[in-house]
Amino acid sequence: MIAQEYKKMLGAKSVIREMFTYGTERAKEIGKENVFDYSLGNPSVPVPEKFTKKMIELLETESPVALHGYSPSLGIDSVREAVAVSLEKRFGLPYKKEHIFMCSGAAAALAHAFRAVTVPGDSILTFAPFFPEYNPYVNLTGAKLKVVPPDLKGFQIDFEKFETMLTNDVTAVLINTPNNPSGIVYTTETVKELARIMEKKAAEYGHEIYLISDEPYREIVF
């Protein structure tokens, strides 16, 4: 028997998915060049030529087992080291290999992060509007996703509502900037005030409140 909760989740309506399916079917009818698909986040920008050449080189010279086999649980050491060096260079923070956990995509990374900082009965706080798949990722941990209503003036954070909802059961705050679906980027002032309130509440409750920052669109600039 299929669990009813999972069956309900799989059967939930997704307007974005419906738009994508419709766009795919229309492309077959009138040609792909005549369909502008703004549904799923599939970037159309080509990958850097340097990356493509390196992939071809590895396919032609490396052992298939090394390329396609299992990696260590935390990721290949040399890759983790390279990511740490890149992050330190770009953001000026003291990242080390030990801080890096490689995942197969952002969804897996979020699922691991949620599981790492919650136990059943805890809550994670995020802000509307938000990526709807956060809900099942959090629910699978036994925790609950609580949503702070949006600041409709500028889609930054309504700090009065945020502080009210940052209760003792909240173990993590999830932000997404640039935001999906609004495209809003949080200002420096917004992030600093967010951190101030989180630190104050963590001291008040006597436990850590972690900040999880989902940034898949950070590198995309128009």
For every predicted segment, state its role:
Residues 65-206, 212, 218-220:
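Conserved core of the PLP fold type I
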Residues 41-44, 216-220:
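Short, internal active-site loops enriched in acidic
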Residues 2-105, 112:
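N-terminal small-domain helix-loop-helix segment of the aminotransferase-like
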